[in-house]
């Protein structure tokens, strides 16, 4: 019989996140356990956030948004990663369960954005807005992020 939880030590924040995600996520995927506790060398709020993110990552329904983005490549022509990080930051505390996609190009981006409740697939100075799989309109200019946030709050 395997012993999965024999130690309770946090380690550094990032390594603690990785170890907790792998250990707790692995057990949950195997159907082991009905309660989780994440220990990190961080504020208790960060531990709770990590727990919710682990649950979300293994497919459990969790209140709040899930923000996805692409790893970016040579086709990326706008600040996709920065926008995704800012969207996630602005949605902290938002309780509606939605999947938000911020994709970096017009080649693969539209497919991923269609899979989300709301998403954008960007190009140079613009992004196509998708809501529930349908292209709705182009967002243009220097305030694509603000325009996108307005649309997120509408759904």
Language-model segments: residues:
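Glycine-rich phosphate-binding active-site loops on the catalytic face of alpha/beta enzymes
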Residues: 30-44, 122-135
């Amino acid at each position: 019989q395997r012993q999965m939880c024999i130690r309770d030590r946090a380690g550094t924040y990032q390594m603690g996140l990785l170890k907790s995600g792998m250990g707790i996520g692995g057990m949950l995927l195997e159907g082991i356990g009905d309660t989780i506790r994440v220990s990190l060398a961080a504020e208790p709020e960060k531990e709770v956030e990590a727990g919710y993110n682990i649950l979300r990552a293994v497919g459990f329904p969790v209140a709040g948004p899930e923000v996805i983005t692409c790893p970016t490549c040579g086709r990326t022509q706008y600040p996709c990663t920065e926008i995704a990080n800012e969207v996630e930051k602005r949605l902290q505390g938002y309780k509606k369960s939605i999947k938000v996609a911020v994709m970096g190009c017009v080649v693969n981006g539209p497919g991923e954005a269609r899979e989300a409740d709301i998403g954008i697939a960007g190009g140079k100075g613009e992004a196509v807005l998708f809501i529930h799989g349908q292209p709705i309109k182009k967002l243009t200019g220097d305030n694509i992020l603000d325009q996108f946030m307005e649309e997120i709050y509408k759904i």
